[in-house]
Amino acid sequence: MSQEKQVFSIDLAGRQLTVETGQLAKQANGAVLVRYGDTAVLSTATASKEAKNVDFFPLTVNYEERLYAVGKIPGGFIKREGRPSEKAILASRLIDRPIRPLFADGFRNEVQVVSIVMSVDQDCSSEMAAMLGSSLALSISDIPFEGPIAGTTVGRINGEFVINPTVEQQEQSDIHLVVAGTKDAINMVEAGADQVPEETMLEAIMFGHDEIKRLIAFQEEIVQAVGKEKSEVKLYEVDADLNQAVREMAEKDMHSAIQVHEKHAREDAINEVKKRVIEHYEAQEADADTLGQVNEILYKIVKEEVRRLITVEKIRPDGRKGDEIRPLASEVGILSRTHGSGLFTRGQTQALSICTLGALGDVQILDGLGVEESKRFMHHYNFPSFSVGETRPMRGPGRREIGHGALGERALEPVIPSEKDFPYTVRLVSEVLESNGSTSQASICGSTLAMMDAGVPLKAPVAGIAMGLVKTGEHYTILSDIQGMEDHLGDMDFKVAGTAHGVTALQMDIKIDGLSREILEEALQQAKVGRVHILNHMLSVIAEPRTELSAYAPKIITMTINPDKIRDVIGPSGKQINKIIEETGVKIDIEQDGTVFISSINQEMNDKAKKIIEDIVREVQVGEIYEGKVKRVEKFGAFVELFSGKDGLVHISELALERVGKVEDVVKIGDVITVKVIEIDKQGRVNLSRKVLLKEEQEKEAAKEENKQEQQ
């Protein structure tokens, strides 16, 4: 590869995308700087010279955010980037998934792909720049990568598809799709949508693939110009004689074990065969490498037989038909003190989801590279080891948990009511209690049940289903509601979530080169049938959201004040608002447009806080009459509190009908008197009169007396 800087450009959605090679990170196997608008991402690919002694392909993909890219200094005491943000973890997974299938089976050299985001133009996706950069860094390197791949985002505005929509366009779009693939096929899909029909989603995917072909042609030109010759790497292979011997010893028994329908019984039967074969070779004092090869051969026997049964005999490991859903069971309200709970069970997969409602002040604050500063809807997914009957250390969420949580969040967000209609922060936590595949989709179903139990007025209930594929040559079988073994040994994990009206989320991962339009279309239609079946089951448990919130959920009242009065409610250094909070125990959130949200479990305290705020922002009008308490007495008059935070002056001459020598002769501190507003001066000072009201009363009495005399 030439070590001199070279620049290549292409127009992408009306903005220039530029690739620079030969200047930065020259010690990496491959490196490119991708500029898209003002976004700049440095992508590098590095590989170990020797294969690792592992039974898998050790690929690591990192998407690294730097806050200098948006002109920010990290918060906190240390003032440097810490652990990756959720967005960075999701971007790493997004890049990993289309790249991983394009390395040869048996390639065991460690590969690391790193993309550092150095500058961000919000209208030009840094994730898509990083995906293109990662593919190019691998393609121009000497690493044996069978790409390139490319990815693009697709939106839809007023029925028209848009490539790489800007921030403004994304707000108007009802589809948020990321699609990646090779020039021949699609191999990764990630999408959120606002209840969009399957046919439209398929059209959006194919629309994105047309752009992908153009980006791949662009990459091929760059590889032609600056690419290195690919290294000759010896791929891992098991010994042919050993392979034959193990197969003769284990195949028949393994085939019988695989056809045990119950998960744990099947695993025990398979492990018994493995144990017998391993013990045979241990007795012959086989070394660790040989035992490793034996394990790999046994794994291949299982994989081949499972795939043969599915594609040839149309038999699934648990005996179901291809489009059959496992038995369903659901329950709501099983946790008394939570705001809402839903238990969803599908075969041996079980998720318990809990809904918690909070004030708008409980929103999650986001400190990253995006334009979004906070979010009021969250879904978190936990996968403890006991869910699969194993033991392991309990640590924080990993990439998988974060990815599954984000998928559930994306699926449910389109049906969450607006802040105006439901002024709450909503947090969902899905605890996976049993796992045999499709746990992320079970968490979506459980979360829908939990929100309906909590009284969240969803636009429509959402269910999710995971579809699988086993493909051999031109023959393939699409599976509904895949279980763990089918996911592990199959070619596709295609998750589809949505309502009865359309799709709200898609996620597709595949282990083969790519999928055709026909297979995608069939999978989407089969998923729709399964999704509607699951929705009908859920609605038989709870038909609609509860009309009342839990007694333990906060009550929120909304009021609107003049935006100019916000400063009065807050007070200097927050003194006034903190006083209200301390006095009532409520939470208060104020929007810039003057909308005030008051929340507390105690409705009486909510009402009290509202009254205080109303008094603070109330405008005094000339001619209004108040009953107020005398707060202060001076020689020239008395100061009367009309309502909380607002005083007025009754001049000594306005205290009584007769001449007053001393204010104290008429009123003293603590007296409650009725006064009328007679003037508000240019400085906003309120002048009051008691005399005017006394005179009016005197005149009324005189008029009454006169009427009485006339009637006599």
UniProtKB/Swiss-Prot annotation:
**What are its GO cellular component terms?**
cytosol
**Catalyzed reactions:** RNA(n+1) + phosphate = RNA(n) + a ribonucleoside 5'-diphosphate
Q: Which Pfam families match?
A: KH_1 (PF00013), PNPase (PF03726), RNase_PH (PF01138), RNase_PH_C (PF03725), S1 (PF00575)
Methyltransferase as UniProt keyword: no
Q: Which cofactor does it need?
A: Mg(2+)
Q: What does this protein do?
A: Involved in mRNA degradation. Catalyzes the phosphorolysis of single-stranded polyribonucleotides processively in the 3'- to 5'-direction.
- By what name is this protein known? Polyribonucleotide nucleotidyltransferase
EC category: transferase
Query: Can you supply a Gene Ontology BP term from the record?
Result: RNA processing
Q: Where does the record place the KH domain?
A: 554-613
Database matches in PANTHER family: POLYRIBONUCLEOTIDE NUCLEOTIDYLTRANSFERASE, POLYRIBONUCLEOTIDE NUCLEOTIDYLTRANSFERASE 1, MITOCHONDRIAL
Domain (S1 motif): give its ranges.
623-691
Q: InterPro entries per the record?
A: ExoRNase_PH_dom1, ExoRNase_PH_dom2, ExoRNase_PH_dom2_sf, KH_dom, KH_dom_type_1, KH_dom_type_1_sf, NA-bd_OB-fold, PNPase
Cell location: Cytoplasm
| Alphabetical UniProt keywords | Cytoplasm, Magnesium, Metal-binding, Nucleotidyltransferase, RNA-binding, Transferase
* Residues bound to Mg(2+): 487, 493
Q: Which gene encodes it?
A: pnp
As recorded in UniProt, its EC number(s) are 2.7.7.8
User: Could you tell me which species this protein originates from?
Assistant: Bacillus cereus (strain 03BB102)
